[in-house]
């Protein structure tokens, strides 16, 4: 679903999210979750009945309570993408085990299917990174679902690399 982006000459505007875009952004997030459900080999991901009405509020609350922000990408006033980012909260373990650089977290990124490959995702990430720098973040991080090879390729193309790997083993069933 997410593909590496190629820049083309298209007018793309990045703005702060506001509630007038709620329905379109909720639909984009549902499309992303549906894709993740489809590519999940263990079939753990799901698209619950409450997802559309509740997930956007959850994502915004998470971002805004952690000194974050939410962005929309538009072309001709049409919403074509959404991104959210936040400043990573530090806990006691972080203070004991890391030199604690401030990190920005890309928590959400979705581009409308017909706009993929046109530089929209790249532009959203660039604005997130700029905001992170304004907050004195030393790093930008993103958690990518393992089977989402397209997203991994997209972020690799923007200079992101693996640092941690989550491993999983099924214990019963």
Where do the PLM segments sit?
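Conserved N-terminal entry element of GNAT/NAT acetyltransferase domains
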Residues: 1-23, 27, 31-38
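Conserved GNAT-fold acetyl-CoA-binding loop/helix
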Residues: 34-58
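A short helix-loop-beta-strand connector motif used in the catalytic cores of GNAT acetyltransferases and
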Residues: 54-71, 105
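Conserved beta-strand in the GNAT
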Residues: 72, 78-87, 105, 110
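Conserved acyl-donor/pantetheine-binding loop and adjacent beta-alpha core of acyl/acetyltransferases
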Residues: 84, 89-104
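Conserved acetyl-CoA pyrophosphate-binding loop and the N-cap/start of the following alpha-helix
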Residues: 115, 119-127
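Conserved GNAT acetyl-CoA-binding A-motif
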Residues: 125, 132-144
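Conserved beta-strand-loop-alpha-helix junction that forms the acyl-donor binding cleft
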Residues: 141-151, 168-173
């Amino acid at each position: 679903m997410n593909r590496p982006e190629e820049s083309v000459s298209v007018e793309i505007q990045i703005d702060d999210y506001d509630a007038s875009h709620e329905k379109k952004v909720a639909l984009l997030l549902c499309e992303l979750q549906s894709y993740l459900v489809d590519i999940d080999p263990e079939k753990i991901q799901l698209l619950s009945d409450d997802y559309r009405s509740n997930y956007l509020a959850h994502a915004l609350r998470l971002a805004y309570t952690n000194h974050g922000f939410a962005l929309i990408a538009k072309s001709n006033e049409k919403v074509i993408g959404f991104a959210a980012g936040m400043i990573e909260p530090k806990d006691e373990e972080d203070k004991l085990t890391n030199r604690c650089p401030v990190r920005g977290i890309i928590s959400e990124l979705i581009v409308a299917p017909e706009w993929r490959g046109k530089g929209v995702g790249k532009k959203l990430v660039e604005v997130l990174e700029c905001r992170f720098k304004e907050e004195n973040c030393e790093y930008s991080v993103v958690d990518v679902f393992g089977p989402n090879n397209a997203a991994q390729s997209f972020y690799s193309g923007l200079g992101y690399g693996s640092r941690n790997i989550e491993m999983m083993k099924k214990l019963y069933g």
